[in-house]
């Protein structure tokens, strides 16, 4: 009985389903607009979408499953249907615009003629076939341009189109602002990053191939030693925090036994890499050896009572050493400063760059000129009627300057005037000395003392009793005479002294090349009777460097503070790691 009831129920289920299912609507999706709608169950493969009014009914081949009358309709389909007629009363500017086609507008804002022209353009573009397939885009653009020129919009529709474009531009202008803001933000960020990179000048793996290979070896060794300490602590505590591979678990106990040797190798390798490094030393480079020494000391400590604490300290040192090794290997560094020799000529703080050195160089140059003149005057030091020296006897430093025709003429005229003044001077005026002329001789002695120095006399010293122009008062390097030597003339030089002073007063013109060579004889003879003077060396010229001592002291104090704070943070982190390992792996 029960079996018959079960068979009857099973047989009645399909019958009930076929009877009830057609009465329930099913949900379908339009193939064109992708919108869902509910239709009768029998029409699930042949329905018209209420949204897009398209027929949905297809065969297995993808064709329609019935004949569609619209496919055989020859009337061209209009993409823009004309709307309702507006009132005859002009309400807008476009309606009051005269002299244009006032045809009724469609729903898109264009008149019927312009809509027809746009439809023709679309059809012709769809039927376009290029002559050359390689120039398909160029030919299409030319063809479209010709069609738009042929079917132009009327003035009314042209204004309507421009108004619509301006309205859309105002409506969506915020999108352009957002675009420009994003572009500016991204560009400024990239520029800042590039500028910071150029300013910092930090480079990855710039220490050299040998140094980077040693750093990488230190990193690998530190990681292996850290895993060995973790495995030892796990086995000692009976916990399993990290599941390591079986092969690695077999090797790590052997590595832990030789932890002292591995730490020593890491320490030695790090020192060798530091000496061969082409970059600057950083803080991890200084902290890593300290931690390695501490780890080696924990290995040397052997006490049963402190075995657990020593293991925790050893694990903390291994973990922190791994972190520092990663920082040493992977962080960018600045390169070392280029070593440049401190040459006297090129150094900014050398003696050659000071005014004293410039004057001393001018002093030596003038002394060489006077020595050259002395060698010429040794031939006839007391013959005023001697012929003037030739131009080729001038020193080499002035030969290039005085080889021009203008300077040669000036020098020859000066020599002639000097020789005439020697020949026309009376002898009694030279032999006797009148003591009433003491005041004039005092001024002449000042000029003579200026002339007796090793510097080439300046314009002010050579024309002290003459009227000078503004061009002659222009300062020169020769006037920077720091060796202020004033020696009184002895009595034995009274004849030469009066002779040079009187000749200076009677000489009408002066040259920029110093006194005439006939006047240098007294200076040469005077050098035999003058006692050599001790030249005092100038003070230190490195004053600009010493002035920075205060700033360097302040910056050094700040550096000491920063280093102290960093060391304190390192030890605080180390103590926290020791406490963490102690809490995790301490036995109850």
Swiss-Prot record:
Low complexity bias: start-end ranges: 384-396
Membrane topology: Multi-pass membrane protein
Pfam families, per database record: Ima1_N (PF09779)
Keyword Membrane part of the UniProt annotation: yes
Biological processes annotated in GO: embryo development ending in birth or egg hatching; nuclear migration along microtubule
Disrupted-gene phenotype: Nuclear migration defects in hyp7 hypodermal precursor cells.
Keywords from the UniProt entry: Membrane, Nucleus, Transmembrane, Transmembrane helix
Spans traversing the lipid bilayer: 213-233, 255-275, 281-301, 310-330, 565-585
Region of interest (Disordered), residue spans: 378-457
Compositionally biased tracts (Polar residues): 418-430, 441-452
Localization, UniProt: Nucleus inner membrane
InterPro entries, A to Z: Ima1_N, TMEM201
Gene Ontology MF terms: actin filament binding; lamin binding
Domain of life assignment: Eukaryota
Chief location of this protein within or outside the cell: nucleus
Nuclear side: 1-212, 276-280, 331-564
Perinuclear space side: 234-254, 302-309, 586-588
Transmembrane in keyword set: yes
GO cellular component: nuclear envelope; nuclear inner membrane; nuclear membrane
Family: Belongs to the TMEM201 family.
Protein name as annotated: Transmembrane protein 201 homolog
UniProt organism field: Caenorhabditis elegans
Lineage per the UniProt record: Eukaryota, Metazoa, Ecdysozoa, Nematoda, Chromadorea
Gene from which the chain derives: samp-1
